[in-house]
Amino acid sequence: MDVPAFKDAPPAQFRFYIIFHKFLTLEAYENVNPHYIKTYCRFAGVNRKIPKIGPDTLAPYVFEEWQLPVYNPLYQLAKYCESSVFFHTYLNPGLMLDPFKFVGFLHYDMVLDNRLFEFIEHCLEELKDSSKTLFNFYADAAEPHINQNSVNNDRFGYELWENVINLYNTMHGTEFTLDDVRTNSIPLYHSYLVPKGIFKEMMAFAERAIPRIFDLLGCDTTHLPYHIERCHGVFLLLHTLDKKIDRWVQLPGIDHRDDLKDPWQEQQTA
């Protein structure tokens, strides 16, 4: 299947997929050299039910998930939200993953500038071995994120995450506990740049973990997007404790702007 946004891209060590539901704005990229957009960025539209709006100058770099060779609309129906781009990247490796050493994800409401790309280029040039490096935008203490209790369903809290941690232990031969996660921080916002091999391991884990989370949520998708985001973060933390990631590097040049948020959630279910 021909996807124009992927044609004639310059060779690159990393690729960011910038996720949007409804619109893109030039304001978010007016301080980015067009070379960096062409080389390192593609804009991923999700949820086919929502019409897309964007400036003509970005159009050559925009694609929608339904255009991909392997496409599953059920991810959006099941409220995978941003994570549907993660899965479609994983399921279309020849197009979206394998040409690069790193793959990353950002969002339409983040204002970027040249520092982001210059910094990553510098790090990849200077680091002798970057294969265990996680570039992250934001991390927060894990405890408040994994202790979300509900009057009607206590499984929203620790029991759910103990199941997730035990699955990681089974898959990776480790013995991590809830306390190992509770006392550390996790990356959030679906916003990071990950080595290709680690991303593949993260998604292999997510394929098995997310159905379990859905089941533990009483087969209700209401809170599933929240938990999927934390699931990715917990995996990246456990991989760090497992010494498969040896450093977290803070990304500069990203301003997460609430005033650019798309009110799509008020009209549609993603």
Regions found by a protein language model. Name each.
Residues M1-A270:
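ER/Golgi luminal nucleotide-sugar-dependent glycosyltransferases, focusing on the catalytic module
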